[in-house]
Amino acid sequence: TDAQERARGITIFSKQALLEMPGLSVTLLDTPGHVDFSAEAERTLQVLDCAILVVSGSEGLQGHTLTLWKLLARYRVPVLLFVNKMDLPGPGRAALMEQLKARLAPGCTDFGQPEAARNEELALCGEDLMEDFLEAGSLSGEAIAAGVAARRVFPCFFGSALKLDGLDELLAALPRFVQAPAYGQHFSAAVYKVARDPKGERLTFLKITGGALEARALLSGQGDPAQGGEPWQEKVSQIRLYSGAKFTAAERAEAGQVCAVTGLTHTWPGEGLGLRPDAPAPMLEPAMTYQVLLDDGQDPHEALQKLRQLAEEDPQLHISWDEETRQIR
């Protein structure tokens, strides 16, 4: 965990963890929930197979939760909801469900209610679900999973993460109600993050969305359009599978895997590699402009170089140099 994250008690940088569950391997990508770091969250959404949106059970839906919901809709990400902090005073389960249905989607369904009542509710989420329900009197896991994948069904779970209440039900739902995407045979990948390891080595985090990637493979792409978009061709030095701060080196990453690679110096968040197109321009844009004030005696060009390194990791910084005023903005 980053020192700033520990000090503030929040997530600032997206991180990943590898989890092995019965019949399922999961890569968990933890994204910032704080409004100030929304851009980091948006960059990660494009590589998700499914999202778990955490809602405060004590406060209900908040403005930033609605922003995240719009982003998930934009990137067509299937969503499960976990209503947290149910151990604290709040509106209550019934009132929260009404709020979710009214402000998010009618397909938000309480998966903690009796199965018969749940299936009756789910049958209203689509003609195919209604037909299956009328024919069989129930709904199969496959039918519900198809509704989740189509973003017509949004399973809702309630509990308290601090007290580990409700988590077993949420985790058990993943293999039952979340479909694994189908991937093509030819290589494609989505770059969602650029960072540096403790030694300063540049890391390109990407999800393989087709085929496979091998260490020492030669990749090519087009540079960041904001920086001129020059074509590049470079070799992958190492493939790393991260879980927290630790990683294992791999010779190959398959479709569906999230990994970090070294050796690439021109990649940028949102870039598509292989057959993958570049991501659309981000929906969230900075609203304020700041001037960087340096201490007396500091070299502005040296500071600019370091800030541009940060801008590789967060393109929304939009670092610029005004030659006339010799100011960094």
Model-derived features with residue positions:
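Structural and coupling elements of P-loop NTPases
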Residues: T1-R329
